[in-house]
Swiss-Prot record:
One of its GO terms (cellular component) is membrane. This is Small integral membrane protein 12. It comes from the Eukaryota. Pfam families: UPF0767. It comes from Ailuropoda melanoleuca (Giant panda). It is found in: Membrane. It is a single-pass membrane protein. The chain crosses the membrane at residues 15-34. Belongs to the SMIM12 family.
Length: 92
């Protein structure tokens, strides 16, 4: 009798396993929901570091007057003089 029963269970295992697993999962899901109770209020997520940096940079840009810029003539040379004149004696 047992060998016949095991043969039947082995043959029809895929057809029996899914409904049993479905019922067990549904019961477990509802039991967990019942024990836990209501869902807590969602917590507002903090901004990431990059988002805070972007906000800070935007705030800094809003406070500046972009029409007042330094002219190209007033800017320093491309390379500092110390690099170019390192081995040359100073001109007086």
């Amino acid at each position: 009798m047992w060998p016949v029963l095991w043969t039947v269970v082995r043959t029809y295992a895929p057809y029996v396993t899914f409904p049993v697993a479905f019922v067990v999962g549904a019961v477990g899901y509802h039991l967990e929901w019942f024990i836990r109770g209501k869902d807590p209020q969602p917590v507002e997520e903090e901004k990431s570091i990059s988002e805070r940096r972007e906000d800070r940079k935007l705030d800094e840009l809003l406070g500046k007057d972009h029409t007042q810029v330094v002219s190209l003539k007033d800017k320093l040379e491309f390379a500092p003089k110390a690099v170019l004149n390192r081995n040359r004696p100073e001109k007086n």
